Amino acid sequence: MPIQVLPPQLANQIAAGEVVERPASVVKELVENSLDAGATRIDIDIERGGAKLIRIRDNGCGIKKDELALALARHATSKIASLDDLEAIISLGFRGEALASISSVSRLTLTSRTAEQQEAWQAYAEGRDMDVTVKPAAHPVGTTLEVLDLFYNTPARRKFLRTEKTEFNHIDEIIRRIALARFDVTINLSHNGKIVRQYRAVPEGGQKERRLGAICGTAFLEQALAIEWQHGDLTLRGWVADPNHTTPALAEIQYCYVNGRMMRDRLINHAIRQACEDKLGADQQPAFVLYLEIDPHQVDVNVHPAKHEVRFHQSRLVHDFIYQGVLSVLQQQLETPLPLDDEPQPAPRAIPENRVAAGRNHFAEPAVREPVAPRYSPAPASGSRPAAPWPNAQPGYQKQQGEVYRQLLQTPAPMQKPKAPEPQEPALAANSQSFGRVLTIVHSDCALLERDGNISLLSLPVAERWLRQAQLTPGEVPVCAQPLLIPLRLKVSGEEKSALEKAQSALAELGIDFQSDAQHVTIRAVPLPLRQQNLQILIPELIGYLAKQSVFEPGNIAQWIARNLMSEHAQWSMAQAITLLADVERLCPQLVKTPPGGLLQSVDLHPAIKALKDE
């Protein structure tokens, strides 16, 4: 048989073999998409265990009409755009293959509307080539995905589905994990037209324990020891059950989350088990709900088809950090249990649980940024320090550049024709649209360039600052806001709150969305250039800057932010320099025409050449 390119539907079905294991896999992927879209309410309707119908409706930001067809295409995503993004993933989804895979093994319909659109649009793919049809529809702001007749065209996969009850138990377990992670999101789950679970969004404080008790049971809550542990860039929060009172039923509660992503990680389980081993029997398992936050550059989530596992770059450090955090709490445990809220919470209708069928709970999801007031506040170990930005974090595994990069380095920077700043201004001449060819990196942060036989030296941090300012400055439309997976809640003074309210419209144009109450402000979304910054440091500094201003111009605020952003590169590579210059040439063509002295300096080789000739 000759080598040939597979049809799109067959290729998607092969990918679905890894992504879509059962109905619960579909629910997980779609709910994570809703969370990435900034949804605060998600309604999930299931029929016949998910084999007949899976419907996910959210109130997120929605999808534009022009992007609906792309949403159903393979490897199309809004989560990442470059290799650096892949090596510092902060969203739940990033591969852009879930919807394409699901639509290839079911009858999938996607209906969505953004706040800017007057009407909603519906898209579905059909046929051998998976052609996407888009038509008008009625729908509020947000997105609804309907998955009908899962595995209808793959009878072998459908044959391996378990009973309706078992498949729904798997779905129930997935929703349980997500509800534990996102206390700020309301999640409703129904099966065959009946409401089964209602997890209401709860504010900060004691009500988190109410939701914890509703999901994990009062027995776990009564034995739960709160953890709040921090060292450098690592933070551990959550609860671990007192091992002296752990029962087989409690031992099934094992949820861990890494940067908001539910995980099953042997390293984390081993660290917790080791900390509890003196008090656990040989056949006992610890019970815990833990949230680990780590520099995204120091963890690789792209190592498992279903994103169930991660790899830590400094696994021993992470292991010892978790071990010390859990051990410290166990050594300081008190006899009084966690405070229970006296207000009764309406109990959702229960269904018979089958946690064994759903697998042992090694998964977990992220808590909101504001930490629960812990029962124990262990003092940081000697030499520890408050969380700091990650200026020296190197993206990824420091991978060796392959042949593709060697070819890239030999290629001049892209010669794109930028739009003139003003309509009446003539287009730039072709030979002035590029800074030139990158020859090498000098002193880790300068690029040596060659153009038309002339040599110049360019400051990469200054170029990066100009690029960030261009990305942040709003044009005809506001800068796109990226919802934060974990909203940032900060305490502010009356003066700072007043300044924020005056600057709210300007900040909205920059893609910064927030809500304020009496004494706090909650940052809900930021523009893309800020996603990889340490917002716990940057946002308070921005608020302090705004409090000193009387006029709030988006351009001035964008300039201040650009000057205060931490560089993503401690040491520049040639590939990074080439990418940066291509972006600067595209977004800042005026810099190519008249570069400022702090950005580009000519290097005069004539004295050196003359000296060589005189010898």
Curated annotation (Swiss-Prot):
GO terms for molecular function: ATP binding; ATP hydrolysis activity; ATP-dependent DNA damage sensor activity; mismatched DNA binding. InterPro entries: DNA_mismatch_repair_CS, DNA_mismatch_repair_MutL, DNA_mismatch_S5_2-like, HATPase_C_sf, MutL/Mlh/PMS, MutL/Mlh/Pms-like, MutL_C, MutL_C_dimsub. Residues 362-397 are annotated as: Disordered. Keywords: DNA damage, DNA repair. Residues 373-387 have a biased composition (Low complexity). GO terms for biological process: mismatch repair. It comes from the Bacteria. PROSITE patterns: DNA_MISMATCH_REPAIR_1 (PS00058). One of its GO terms (cellular component) is mismatch repair complex. The keyword DNA repair applies. Belongs to the DNA mismatch repair MutL/HexB family. This protein is involved in the repair of mismatches in DNA. It is required for dam-dependent methyl-directed DNA mismatch repair. May act as a 'molecular matchmaker', a protein that promotes the formation of a stable complex between two or more DNA-binding proteins in an ATP-dependent manner without itself being part of a final effector complex. This is DNA mismatch repair protein MutL. The lineage of its organism: Bacteria, Pseudomonadati, Pseudomonadota, Gammaproteobacteria, Enterobacterales.
